């Protein structure tokens, strides 16, 4: 499954990107609420769903320290996520948030771990993956690769997962993990429509073509 990351600054931008993502072959849509210039986030989610008739919409409000744009109060962020969950099929919750059980979304959850510095050892990654899976409906483990050994390690974590798992490595040298992870059983991968939201991210069209070629 290809999840297109939508990074529009306005609701109109989000809708335009959503339509483009569907045309490029996306299977699901991630609405990056932290990119919106206003807080009318429920309306943005509804607009994306209505314009595409998509059944799979992911709501993400990523805080700055995890690569997002949200700089506001954390309690406010969690309040927003809980509220907008009624308009989404999945809400992305960071592992530390899920562990504290502060909020109870009314949809399924992707419990995520992001490491922008490195890729931890295999056993540590497996522990993180399993904890994410225990707390959510889908586990997501994303790390920064400093070489191919790191990339292969994250792929092994995906390959051996028993629960639905998203996993890949960031960085130019490891961009292939975004495609290979799906081919070896990963639940999904993320792709850009225009503006890339993470290091090494491919576009929806690039991802789809590679999956068709290699699959």
UniProtKB/Swiss-Prot annotation:
GO terms for biological process: 3,4-dihydroxybenzoate biosynthetic process; amino acid biosynthetic process; aromatic amino acid family biosynthetic process; chorismate biosynthetic process. It is an enzyme of class 4 (lyase). Pathway: Metabolic intermediate biosynthesis; chorismate biosynthesis; chorismate from D-erythrose 4-phosphate and phosphoenolpyruvate: step 3/7. SUPFAM superfamilies: Aldolase. Its EC number is 4.2.1.10. Disulfide bonds: none annotated. InterPro entries: Aldolase_TIM, DHquinase_I, Type-I_3-dehydroquinase. It catalyses: 3-dehydroquinate = 3-dehydroshikimate + H2O. 3-dehydroquinate binds at residues 30-32, 62, 178, 201. The active site is at residues 114, 140. Gene3D superfamilies: Aldolase class I. Keywords: Amino-acid biosynthesis, Aromatic amino acid biosynthesis, Lyase, Schiff base. GO terms for molecular function: 3-dehydroquinate dehydratase activity. PANTHER family: 3-DEHYDROQUINATE DEHYDRATASE. Homodimer. Involved in the third step of the chorismate pathway, which leads to the biosynthesis of aromatic amino acids. Catalyzes the cis-dehydration of 3-dehydroquinate (DHQ) and introduces the first double bond of the aromatic ring to yield 3-dehydroshikimate. Belongs to the type-I 3-dehydroquinase family. NCBIfam families: aroD. This is 3-dehydroquinate dehydratase.
